[in-house]
Amino acid sequence: MTLLGSEHSLLIRRKFRSVLQLRLQQRRTQEQLANQGLIPPLKGPTEFHDPRKQLDSAKTEDSLRRKGRNRSDRASLVTMHILQASTAERSIPTAQMKLKRARLADDLNEKIALRPGPLELVEKNILPMDSSVKEAIKGTEVSLSKAADAFAFEDDSSRDGLSPDQARSEDPQGSTGSTPDIKSTEAPLDTIQDLTPGSESDKNDAASQPGNQSDPGKQVLGPLSTPIPVHTAVKSKSLGDSKNRHKKPKDPKPKVKKLKYHQYIPPDQKAEKSPPPMDSAYARLLQQQQLFLQLQILSQQQQQQQQQQQQQQQQQQQQQRFSYPGMHQTHLKEPNEQMARNPNPSSTPLSNTPLSPVKNSISGQTGVSSLKPGPLPPNLDDLKVSELRQQLRIRGLPVSGTKTALVDRLRPFQDCAGNPVPNFGDITTVTFPVTPNTLPSYQSSPTGFYHFGSTSSSPPISPASSDLSAAGSLPDTFTDASPGFGLHASPVPACTDESLLSSLNGGSGPSEPDGLDSEKDKMLVEKQKVINQLTWKLRQEQRQVEELRMQLQKQKSSCSDQKPLPFLATTIKQEDVSSCPFAPQQASGKGQGHSSDSPPPACETAQLLPHCVESSGQTHVLSSTFLSPQCSPQHSPLGGLKSPQHISLPPSPNNHYFLASSSGAQRENHGVSSPSSSQGCAQMTGLQSSDKVGPTFSIPSPTFSKSSSAVSDITQPPSYEDAVKQQMTRSQQMDELLDVLIESGEMPADAREDHSCLQKIPKIPGSSCSPTAIPPKPSASFEQASSGGQMAFDHYANDSDEHLEVLLNSHSPIGKVSDVTLLKIGSEEPPFDSIMDGFPGKAAEDLFSAHELLPGPLSPMHAQLSPPSVDSSGLQLSFTESPWETMEWLDLTPPSSTPGFSNLTSSGPSIFNIDFLDVTDLNLNSPMDLHLQQW
C-alpha cells in the first residue's frame, strides 16, 4: 500500500517526536553530570575548578618536555639544511675541504710520478716502436729506467716553468755528449716542445700523456749514440713530468688557447669561450673578407649610381634612334638597373636585363656588367686586387686568380679604355616585330630570353600597325607578320640596321667601341640568324597562303554552281570585300587558311585582304587589325575613327571591330592610299561612321535611316531568290576584282573595286549583321521565322562556307577587322531600336531569322561585324568581355539559333568567342589549327 507524500511526511514527524521524547526522558540530570565531573557543580565551591586547571597545565608541560626530548640536535638540522651552520662552524668544513683537496693533489702527483715512463711502455709493448729503437732500449734498460726517475725528480724544481730548449740549456748533462750528438738531440727536443701543448689538454690525460711523451722518446733515441740515450730519455721524461706537475694552475688558459675549430663545445661553454677564438687569425681573415665584400658592394653601388645618369642620357639618344613613338626606355631601364644594382659580391653571373627595348643579352657577367666600364689607369700594377677585380667584373671577365693574372686580363682593355666591351657570352637577340606599344610585353624574362610571341614575327612595322596593336602583346597579335609583308621596308624610321646597332649598343653606350669588331661581328651574326629565322617563317607562311589560295580558287570553281547565301550572308560577304583593304595581310593569308574549305566569296575576300594590306605600305598597313586581347580599341585602328561612338567602343580581346560606316563614308575611306596612319586606316576600313550621314547602317545599299523609307526597306527584306541573284553577280564581280588584285599585287589606289562591291551589297536587314541590333522581343512568329531561317540555313549550308570564308577572313583572329563594314553602331543604334520596334511583327521576326542564319557560322568572329557603341541600349555586346570569358556563343549556331538569340544581351558578348572552331558546320578547323600553332 503506497503512502501519499503528505502521509509519509506525517509518519516521519511522528517518529521523530517519539525519539525526542525518549531521549529527553532518558537524559541525565545536572546533578548526575556534576557528580561525574562533566559539568561544574551548580552551586559547588571553587576547589573543583582549581585542580582542573592544574591538571591542564601539567598536561601541557609534559607534552612540551616530551617534544624537547625528541627534537633533533643542531648537527642533524644542519645536515638536513633546516639550520644554517654558524660562521664558526663553517670554517671547520672549509678547512677540511682544503685538506681533502691537498690530499687528492698529493695522491695525483704521486701517481703521476710513479706512472710508467715511455721506455716502460715501449718495453711492455703498450706503445708501438721501431725494432731498432726497441733494441737500443733493451741494451740500456736498467740504467735508463733508474736514472730517468732520479733525474726527473731532481730537475723538476729547477725546470718547472722552462720550455724544452731552456731545460736543455740548463741541463748539466747537456755538455757531456759531443756537439753533433747535442745537435742531434735538439731536433727531437723541438718536437717535444711542439707536442707538449697537445698533451696539456687535461690534467687527467694519463693515457694521452705517455703517448705524447713516447714520441719524443722515440725521436730522441733514434739518432742518438749509445752513451747519450740515458740523458735524452731523462730529459724528455723530466720535461713531461714538469709540464704535468704544473698543469693544474694553468688549466683554464691553455684549454682556451688550444681550442680547435672542429672540437665540440657544449652550449653552456660557448657563450664564454666564443670571444677568444674570434681573436684567431682565421676569424680576422673572415672579418677582412667581410669588410672587403662590403667595400666592393659599396663601390659597385656608387659606380652604378654615377653611371645611371650617363646611361639614361645614352638611352634617350638610343630612344631617338629607335624612333618608337611613346616608348620610354627609361621605364624599361630602371627596373633593369635595379636588378643589376643588386650587389653581387661573388662572381655568379646575373643575366643582363635588356636596357634597350630591342636588345636582350644573355650574358655570363655579374650584375655590374651592365655598367659602362670606366677608363683604366695607365699603371694596372698600382691598382689593388679589389680594384682589379672590380674592373674585371664590370667587363664580365673572370675575377679569380692572382694579381698578375688579373692584370694580364685587363691589359687588352687599356688600349680601348672607356669603351664598353661586349661580353663574350652575350647573344643579343633583336626581335624586329616589336611595336612601340608591344614592347612592355617584351621585357625580358629573368632568363634573358625573348619569348617570340608569334612565329610569324616580322620586320619592324609601321607606326600605324603599331598603333593597331597598341596595348597588345606580340604573342597575341599576328599583326606585323603577314605573308604578304615579306620583309618589305616599313615606314618605321629605324631600319633594321639601325635597330641592330642600337640593340648592340643596348644600355651600354650611345655607340659601340670601334675596337673588338669580332665581338660585334658575333652579335651581328647572331642577329642575322634571327632575321633569317624570321624570314624563313614568313616564307613558310607565304607558302601556306599560296596553298590556301589555290584551294580557295578550286573551291570557288566548285562553289560557283552552288546557290549563294541568303541575303544576309551575301551582304556580309560583300561587306567583307569592301572592308578588306583594312584587313591585315596576315589576316588575309590566315583568313584564307581558315576559309580554305569555304566557297569562292571567302577566297575573294581573303585574297583581297593581303593585297590591300600590301598596297598600303604606309601606315595603312593596319595589318594588325586583329586586335590582341590586350589591345584597346583606342590604339586599334578603330581608335582613329572620326565618330565618337566608334571611339567609345570598349576593347574586346579578339573582337575585330567593324564599325559600320555609311556607304558614302565607306567609299571615301576605302581608298587604301590615304596616308593618315590610324585615322586613315579606320577610314580605309570604312569604319568611319560619319555623323552627317546619319544613323545609317553602313550597308552601301539604302542604309537604315530614321526615315520611314529606310524602315520600309528594312521591314521588307529582299526575297531569297533576289539575294541569290545578287550573290551570284557579287561573287562574279569579286572574282574579277580579286583577279585584278592578284595580277597587280596591290589594291588599286582609287579602290574602285571596293566601292563597286560596296554599292552592290544588298541592304542588310538591320539585325542581319549585328546580333546587337535584334530587338529583345522574340515571339511565336519569331520562332517560326527562326525555323524558316534554319531551312534557309539548310539551303545556305553549302554557301555558308563561302559566307564563313568572308566572315572568317574578316573576323578571324588574324586580324581582319574591317572586312565587314557592317552596322554603323553608335548614334545609329537607338534609332535602329526604334526602327525595329516600328516593324510589323512578321518583318522583325524575318530579321531575326535571317540574322540567326549568320551568327551561327559567324559566331565568334561575328563580333567584328558589330562593335556596338557604348550608348546603344539594345547592343549589350560589351567588348570589354574577353571572348574567352563568354563561352555562350555556341548558342548562336544555326541549330539552336532561335533560343540563342532570344538572350541577346547575354549572348551578345559571347558572339566574339573564337570557340567557333568547335562548330562542325565551319570547315575552319584545319586552317585555324595552323593559326593556333603559329600563335
UniProtKB/Swiss-Prot annotation:
Residues modified to Phosphothreonine: 893
SUPFAM superfamilies: SAP domain
Compositional bias segments (type: Polar residues): 172-182, 206-216, 358-369, 585-597, 660-691
Consequence recorded when altering residue 866 to D: No effect on SRF activation. Impairs SRF activation, reduces interaction with EP300 and SM-promoter activation
Post-translational modifications: Ubiquitinated; by STUB1/CHIP at the C-terminus, leading to its degradation by the proteasome. Phosphorylation by GSK3B is required for STUB1/CHIP-mediated ubiquitination. Phosphorylation negatively regulates transcriptional activity. Phosphorylated; by GSK3B.
RPEL repeats: 18-43, 62-87, 106-131
Record-linked InterPro entries: Myocardin-like, RPEL_repeat, SAP_dom, SAP_dom_sf
Coiled-coil boundaries: 287-322, 519-563
Modified residues (Phosphoserine): 454, 458, 462, 466, 624, 628, 632, 636, 812, 859, 866
Key word Transcription present: yes
Quaternary structure note: Homodimer. Interacts with MLLT7/FOXO4. Interacts with SRF, its association does not depend on specific DNA sequences for ternary complex formation. Interacts (via C-terminal) with EP300 (via CREB-binding domain). Interacts with HDAC4 and HDAC5. Interacts with MEF2C. Interacts (via C-terminus) with STUB1/CHIP. Interacts with PURB.
Name the UniProt record assigns to this protein: Myocardin
